[in-house]
């Protein structure tokens, strides 16, 4: 900071504001900043005094004329629009107006004009809604046609993307369905345990998932050796999940599929733990 006089600067240079390690306290981070505050106040006072006497000229932080360039351009555009003559609207003219509810452009017809307030009342074609609009805000009917064409193009693009995604999802479901038919239940794995309340025992045919199953149960207790079927040396083949029908596209069916996957995950986890325990008990019986 520039100082007003040389004497003040030399006096401040001789003043020691802070020296670490000279305090009596062991904590060197706690120190008195009174001298620093006094030096700052003194420097500010001397600068203000020199500025008041005219020794120092205050220079602005920003150059003049640079901060208002953009508003100047805006004013030019406003002047240009003001110089261009507005269209002389009449009662009964067709126009396009922006509806205040959604901000979209709709075709309308002028029903009344207030030249003093430069406003008018328009009726939207095909809707019958009335709304007051400024005469300067009215658009030609061709603007509405261009806007509707652009909206139709965007809707068509979104529809095409939606159709592509649906086609890809259906193809994936058909592939999963064909794979599930090609890989039926094998003798390496027993069928999943019955659902609560179904009345079907393990190994009985006709196990179906008619509705969303309950949350996945806890892993089953340790399996008995008599319950475990013989296992081959290779790893078991895990059956695929039940195929999802193409007509089941609501959230209820998606929730049911998720709960089924949880149920199957808990079943296979308990099945693996029982297999390990059965194998461990078999080793212990051989050693004994």
Curated annotation (Swiss-Prot):
The keyword Phosphoprotein applies. Residues 274-288 are annotated as: Required for interaction with SYNCRIP. InterPro entries: Smn1 (IPR040424), SMN_C (IPR047313), SMN_G2-BD (IPR049481), SMN_Tudor (IPR010304), Tudor (IPR002999), Tudor_SMN_eumet (IPR047298). Residues 146-162 have a biased composition (Polar residues). Expressed in motor neurons. PROSITE patterns: TUDOR (PS50304). Residues 235-262 are annotated as: P2 (binding site for SNRPB). GO terms for biological process: axonogenesis; DNA-templated transcription termination; microtubule depolymerization; positive regulation of RNA splicing; regulation of neuron projection development; spliceosomal snRNP assembly. The modification Phosphothreonine is found at residues 22, 66. Residues 1-29, 54-85, 146-216 are annotated as: Disordered. Keywords: Cell projection, Cytoplasm, Isopeptide bond, mRNA processing, mRNA splicing, Neurogenesis, Nucleus, Phosphoprotein, RNA-binding, Ubl conjugation. GO terms for molecular function: RNA binding. The keyword Ubl conjugation applies. It is found in: Nucleus, Gem; Nucleus, Cajal body; Cytoplasm; Cytoplasmic granule. Residues 88-148 form the Tudor domain. The modification Phosphoserine is found at residues 5, 25, 28. Residues 10-41 are annotated as: P1 (binding site for GEMIN2). Homooligomer; may form higher order homooligomers in the dimer to octamer range. Part of the core SMN complex that contains SMN1, GEMIN2/SIP1, DDX20/GEMIN3, GEMIN4, GEMIN5, GEMIN6, GEMIN7, GEMIN8 and STRAP/UNRIP. Part of the SMN-Sm complex that contains SMN1, GEMIN2/SIP1, DDX20/GEMIN3, GEMIN4, GEMIN5, GEMIN6, GEMIN7, GEMIN8, STRAP/UNRIP and the Sm proteins SNRPB, SNRPD1, SNRPD2, SNRPD3, SNRPE, SNRPF and SNRPG. Component of an import snRNP complex composed of KPNB1, RNUT1, SMN1 and ZNF259. The Tudor domain mediates association with dimethylarginines, which are common in snRNP proteins. Belongs to the SMN family. This is Survival motor neuron protein. It comes from Mus musculus. The lineage of its organism: Eukaryota, Metazoa, Chordata, Craniata, Vertebrata. The gene is Smn1.
